[in-house]
Amino acid sequence: MKNIFTGIFLLVSACFMQAQTPNYYRNPDKIYLDSKEGHNGSFTWQMHKADETKDPAEKISQPGYQTGKWMPAIVPGTVLNSLVHNKMYPEPYYGMNNKLDRNIIPDLAKTGREFYTYWFRTEFDVPENYKDKIVWLQVDGINYRAEIWVNGYLLGNMSGMFKPEYINIDILRFEHA
């Protein structure tokens, strides 16, 4: 009788472990712009506080823009994720770090949204084997508002928490051809 309970327990444990295994499936027909920092992705993302950036969006979003002293960014992730990664603030989910009355991590309600408004940028190439495909940029990590700029063009605005948005960037591929 003891062996039956052990067998059932092991079966149930295996089911729970399987249920908690994250799904890392990546569609081979897509390019994922995950950052090297934090996600071991293939792309170098950088960020800079918007009100400290004097250049216009048309220039910042151009290939080859010199970022100078921009910080590494975690993508997908939030502004706060990247600020914590860069040791600007402590981990909010540790101890009492995020408690309002401690004033360790600035609260948006007190600072205003400009405080957490940053430029995020990376550069990527559309592979040659995408030549006969329509190319979409899928953005699904925005929290809370963003303008999407590519190659000097404003392609869209979005707002909401982490909702996916799909932007056709196919026309830009042929701009410099």
Residue ranges of predicted features:
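Accessory carbohydrate-binding/adhesion or oligomerization-edge regions at the termini
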Residues: 19-100
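Bacterial Sec-dependent N-terminal signal peptides
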Residues: 1-22
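Low-complexity, intrinsically disordered/propeptide-like segments
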Residues: 8, 13-14, 36, 83-86, ...
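Accessory beta-strand-rich segments of carbohydrate-active enzymes
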Residues: 21-30, 48-52, 86, 91-92, ...
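Generic structural signal for beta-strand residues in well-ordered domains
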Residues: 9, 38, 63, 128-130, ...
